[in-house]
Every structure is written in structure tokens, then in C-alpha cells.
Amino acid sequence: MSLAFIDPMIIRSLNKSKLRKKILYLLYKMYPHGIYLSEISRRVRSDPSNVLGCLKGMNGRYNGHFSLIELGLVECVERGGVKIYKLTDYGKKIVEVLKDQDSDFIESLRW
């Protein structure tokens, strides 16, 4: 299914942060399964606090309005007291639309 319109806030959010984009593409690769914060952090090679900021927003550094969860691209599911982050169906559709435009970026990722 193709999307005719992508919210400009999503485009802006992803263009302003390579880390947000890395996290989104990692979760797309893992879809439909989720992954722990520490594992996301390890795979994208970034500090867990920065990853959490991209996912949920954090103080002034990562605006919550532009977080992957707030934009509806990622969801947090709690299982047995542990938080798992996974791509939403909407997030999957967004990635499928954007991945052709981001082919150079995707090739640069080394999981």
C-alpha cells in the first residue's frame, strides 16, 4: 500500500536527525518484532540516552513533538516489566515510501 501524503512533520523530524532515521530503519529491519533500548543503542552505535531521546523526546535536546513515538512511527510495548520498541504499521508504510529516496543513507548503515 502506498501513501499519497506524508506529514511534513515526519519528514522534518527525520531530516533533522540521522539518529532518528537510523533507529527507524533498524526497527524496519526487525519488523514485526521489537527490540530493547540497549540493543537499539548498540546497533546504531549511540548512547542509550540519545536513543531514548529520539524515541520519546527528552528535555530540550530532543523535542517530544518530533519523537518517533509521538509521530506514531514507533510504539513501546511493556512485556514482563521490560520495554520493547517496535515499528508501527504506519511507521512501516512511511519507511517503505522513503527507502527509495534514502538508498544511499541505507547503504551507509552497518548493522
From Swiss-Prot:
Pfam families recorded: EarA
InterPro entries xref list: ArsR-like_HTH, EarA-like, WH-like_DNA-bd_sf, WH_DNA-bd_sf
Top-level taxon: Archaea
UniProt xrefs under Gene3D superfamilies: Winged helix-like DNA-binding domain superfamily/Winged helix DNA-binding domain
CDD domains: HTH_ARSR
Transmembrane segments: none
S-S bonds: none
Leader sequence segment: none
Protein name as it appears in the record: Uncharacterized protein MJ0905
Source organism of this protein record: Methanocaldococcus jannaschii (strain ATCC 43067 / DSM 2661 / JAL-1 / JCM 10045 / NBRC 100440)
Taxonomy of the source species: Archaea, Methanobacteriati, Methanobacteriota, Methanomada group, Methanococci
